[in-house]
């Protein structure tokens, strides 16, 4: 009997453990090993929105990124925090802290601010780190104008909070894949409207937690669907889909150019980690090709309507041209209005000239004979008459 292959999350976990050498990370520090939890390990807390606070940190930690966790937190959360630390920071700092609470046992501090988490959300963490990094750079412009492209002389390069190091291999893809991991006993919500509503709530919650500040379209957090998550888990070595672009922030001469990496506007691809000597990630895999649809009744009706309108427009144009030509055509002289020398005839003259005159009746006298006299008739005949 052939056993089914393990699910994608397990394969991904094994690959990450072997890739990132987590034996150094998962091992508990000496200070944590001797502090047992009186009530045992805490269960996994419910998933709540992250909270951003301002902290007072030492001078050594002011310019770096540190990851705090409660020693009694669930081991699954510790493992996720360790993976996240190695993905985003070259030399992560994992510090146990007993002052954390059960509802938010994980805290990420960077440049004087802290992000308290209940679960590991790589998309939110990456977006928050990106914003904090840019705020820090905007502040440093006013005070360190001469050293914009390098570290300050008083601060070592390792404390600059470098977000990408030697182990940055497809970091955005791995970090985004962490979002699909569920702790033991957690139920995965079904696909459909429920998942879409949860994603909308998470987007709104992220904006509320981060201060309701507008971000450029290239930095907005995009929550992928379950199908894209499975595809990213299966194609770990080739895919490079990420919710946000991680910055390098290195101390080199081109550190600012790597930090301010621009997104290609045409493809909407959020690039991977821009490490030195690393091949640029492949563009985002396009969706299934759209099948060409045939003409529908509505499109045919629209085509006929367009043809009819075109015909009417042509007909109207021809009629207008014909009217213009007819008006400009020189007609012959009228039989009623003849040409005049001075064109100053009066109405009476026109009527007298044009109206037909009545025929005169000739009056005949009674004494004149109707017939002319004959030569035979003489004066006798006249006297007899």
Curated annotation (Swiss-Prot):
Primary localization: membrane
Low complexity bias spans: 281-297
This protein's UniProt keywords: Cell membrane, Cytoplasm, Membrane, Signal, Transmembrane, Transmembrane helix
Cytoplasmic side: 323-385
Residues on Extracellular side: 28-301
Biased composition (Basic residues): 359-369
Location of region: Disordered: 242-297, 359-385
One Gene Ontology CC term in the entry: cytoplasm
GO biological process, one term: negative regulation of cell cycle
Membrane spanning stretches: 302-322
UniProt key word Zinc: no
Compartments where located: Cell membrane; Cytoplasm
Segment forming the signal sequence: 1-27
Its membrane topology: Single-pass type I membrane protein
Keyword Membrane: yes
Job of this protein: May act as a tumor suppressor. Inhibits tumor cell growth, when overexpressed.
UniProt name for this protein: Tumor protein p53-inducible protein 13
Origin species: Mus musculus (Mouse)
